Curated annotation (Swiss-Prot):
Transmembrane segments: none
Protein name according to UniProt: Elongation factor Tu 2
Root EC class: hydrolase
Subcellular localization: Cytoplasm
Length: 396
């Protein structure tokens, strides 16, 4: 049989399972692929296949992640599942697996547990926009009142971290029963209900090309008779010849105009998200632009020096620090294409941060960087990665 071409006719959405250890995230992932494959085609994955997650690297950090995909009536989903808690923390902070929505798995028998809370907090900090709840192991609970109680607890916990607890869809089921072929309400029916909710509750994300133009500066050249060319990969949006552009970060913002876009030595009318381009700037001197700045649509992004962040500190085994760090620690923060020194403020009551920890901190940079909430960065010491982080909230 000839191999069928991957036809992307359906919109593509990225999701993942989160929740406490042993609440059934991987079993649910296996159940979703198994049941949706029967209905919409694709490839089913067993628990064992998903559980043996391969290693991948993101921002110098090794993470174990399983990727599966499945189809529903309306969409194509890419779904990530991690074997261990530390992998979730690293995955969410590095943005290795960007999620348009998360499926929070909570055991109906246990209710919310410490990692349930931590994953909800992480989802809030790193900007996962939507959470759907799958209350698993419902076959182990006979008491309807107990199910209601667990549901209330979950809703309260979501609201506490600024998710719409009262309106969050909660599906009650048993992933194991569904995998075993149970056609009842908590078996296959619950999985199909979950698929419907994924389709209806998570809106289609904005495509990168539809956003405001931004391009991190990688290199700057001066071409005699033509002016200054800035090269880089367009992160978001479209830039056209004649567009006004701001150069943001590291020094006061300046305005300029794009007078040419070239790619592979050919002149284009425009460059768009994903393209590696050279952008010719009118009247801008070579020394006015440097690596680490961004070219952006005027007013769409501002330079900042102070922000709160969620960070993960590499353990010694991962090639990170061997010793803890304390308040006032001054590493380099690597944003997009450059390092900027900054100091870390720890939360009240926290004396030190150990290798392998994740924590919320405030950061003060010595030079401004173009940023908005959700921007990822690496933490480095002399060019060596010792941590990863994400901007939770810009302060000033």
């Amino acid at each position: 049989m000839a191999k069928s071409k991957f036809e992307r006719v359906k919109p593509h959405i990225n999701v993942g399972t989160i929740g406490h250890v042993d609440h059934g995230k991987t079993t649910l992932t296996a159940a979703i692929t198994t049941i949706l494959t029967r209905k919409f085609g694709g490839e089913a994955k067993s628990y064992a296949q998903i559980d043996s997650a391969p290693e991948e690297r993101a921002r110098g950090i090794t993470i174990n992640t399983s990727h599966v995909e499945y189809e529903t009536d309306k969409r194509h989903y890419a779904h990530v599942d991690c074997p261990g808690h530390a992998d979730y923390v690293k995955n969410m902070i590095t943005g290795a697996a960007q999620m348009d929505g998360a499926i929070l798995v909570v055991s109906a028998a246990d209710g919310p547990m410490p990692q349930t809370r931590e994953h909800i907090l992480l989802a809030r900090q790193v900007g996962v926009p939507y959470i759907i709840v799958f209350m698993n192991k419902a076959d182990m609970v006979d008491d309807a009142e107990l199910l209601e109680l667990v549901e209330m607890e979950i809703r309260e916990l979501l609201s506490k971290y600024d998710f719409p607890g009262d309106d969050t869809p909660i599906i009650i089921g048993s992933a194991l029963k569904a995998l075993e072929g149970d056609k009842g309400d908590i078996g296959e029916a619950a999985i199909l209900k979950l698929a419907e909710v994924l389709d209806s509750y998570i809106p289609e994300p904005q495509r990168a090309i539809d956003g405001a133009f931004i391009m991190p500066v990688e290199d700057v050249f001066s071409i005699s008779g033509r002016g200054t060319v800035v090269t880089g990969r367009v992160e978001r949006g479209i830039v056209k010849v004649g567009d006004e552009i701001e150069i943001v970060g590291l020094r006061p913002t300046i305005k300029t105009t794009c007078t040419g876009v070239e790619m592979f030595r050919k002149l284009l009318d425009q460059g768009q998200a994903g393209d590696n381009v050279g952008i010719l700037l009118r009247g801008t001197k070579r020394e006015e632009v440097e690596r680490g700045q961004v070219l952006a649509k005027p007013g769409s992004i501002l330079p900042h020096t102070k922000f709160s962040a969620e960070i993960y500190v590499l353990s010694k085994e991962e090639g990170g620090r061997h010793t803890p760090f304390f308040a006032g620690y001054r590493p380099q923060f690597y944003f997009r294409t450059t390092d900027v020194t900054g100091s870390i403020e720890l939360p009240a009551g926290v004396e030190m941060v150990m290798p392998g920890d994740n924590i919320s901190v405030n950061v003060n940079l010595i030079a401004p960087i173009a940023m908005s909430d959700g921007l990822r960065f690496a933490i480095r010491e002399g060019g060596r990665t010792v941590g990863a982080g994400v901007v939770a909230k810009v302060i000033e």
